[in-house]
A protein has these predicted regions:
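Active-site neighborhood of HAD-like aspartate-dependent phosphohydrolases
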Residues: 1-50
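Asp-based, Mg2+/Mn2+-dependent phosphohydrolase catalytic module
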Residues: 1-4, 19, 116, 120, ...
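Residues in soluble alpha-helical coiled-coils and helical-bundle/repeat scaffolds
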Residues: 15-16, 106, 110, 184
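An amphipathic alpha-helix signature
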Residues: 22-26, 30, 45, 67-75, ...
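Alpha-helical elements of Rossmann-like donor-binding domains used by nucleotide-donor carbohydrate transfer enzymes
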Residues: 23-27, 47, 73-76, 100, ...
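Short helix-capping segments at alpha-helix termini
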Residues: 31-37, 80-88, 147-151, 180-181
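A metal-dependent, Asp-based hydrolase signature
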Residues: 46, 50-100
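Short, acidic loop-to-helix structural element flanking the phosphoryl-transfer center
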Residues: 63, 68, 91-92, 99-130
Length: 248
């Protein structure tokens, strides 16, 4: 069936978040005098990302709020750094610490180099939208900052407001409804194999897994999921760059 709409994941697909995260955390730890609390910058980043994954998963399961997971991530990270009283840090203090980190991270945030050219190519031919495991105000602000918000139909569909997170079928179907296009006529593009590609395919959309590592990319651009030696499931198309979407 012909495609009439395209939905996108944000982080790791359009927004190169890993590089901004690493630079922002390093700068923040220097400013806070915490760099010596870890064996190396790489170890600090490893701890930060491990805690982020755990606390963000709690948010996605509905066990914490979007703000709450940031506060708890901050407490646990500072506790890992040996900061006295970190575990009992008040919400406003934890939120202020995280806000300072985010401000530093945001100075280096950018879209992937292939994002704008791909969206320019698609915008005149398809309805474009966003389905993201995040909060709407957060993702709208981010997309505006990296110059991509204007490409997408409103509402942006995000898990906090929708009430369920990818890979639940309902959030993909809500994205299709926002476009006004039937699921079978919508492609979903994301960098996480299980959450994005398998979830979209199982919801009845045309699934496209962005695996930047397939094109030789590493680090900030690597896709997440199946692994280099694993063949994708039936019904999942693999691309190494968003520029390949021109052949939809």
């Amino acid at each position: 069936m012909a495609i009439r709409g395209v939905l996108f994941d944000v982080d790791g697909t359009l927004y190169a978040f890993e590089g901004a995260e690493e630079a922002g955390l390093h700068e923040h730890l220097v400013a806070e005098g915490l760099t010596e609390r870890f064996a190396s910058p790489a170890e600090a980043l490893r701890v930060w990302r491990e805690l982020k994954e755990e606390e963000y998963d709690r948010f996605l399961r509905g066990e914490s709020t979007f703000t709450g997971q940031k506060n708890e991530r901050t407490r646990r990270f500072l506790a890992a750094a040996g900061v006295v009283g970190a575990s009992e840090l008040a919400d406003d203090a934890a939120a202020a610490w995280f806000a300072d980190y985010a401000a530093r991270k945001n100075t280096t945030r950018r879209a992937f180099d292939d994002a704008k050219p791909a969206l320019d190519d698609l915008a005149g031919r398809y309805r474009l939208g966003v389905v993201s495991n995040s909060a709407t105000v957060h993702q709208r602000s981010k997309l505006e900052a990296i110059g991509l918000l204007g490409y997408f139909a409103e509402p942006l569909v995000c898990s906090q407001e929708h009430g369920a997170a990818k890979p639940a079928a309902s959030i993909f179907l809500a994205g299709c409804e926002a476009l006004g296009v039937a699921p079978a006529e919508v492609a979903y593009v994301g960098d996480n194999y299980e959450t994005d590609a398998v979830g979209a395919r199982d919801a009845g959309l045309q699934a496209i897994w962005l695996d930047r590592s397939a094109g030789g990319a590493t680090g900030d651009g690597a896709g997440v999921g199946a692994g280099a030696d694993t063949a994708p499931d039936t019904g999942i198309r693999v691309i190494a760059s968003l520029t390949e979407l021109g052949s939809l």
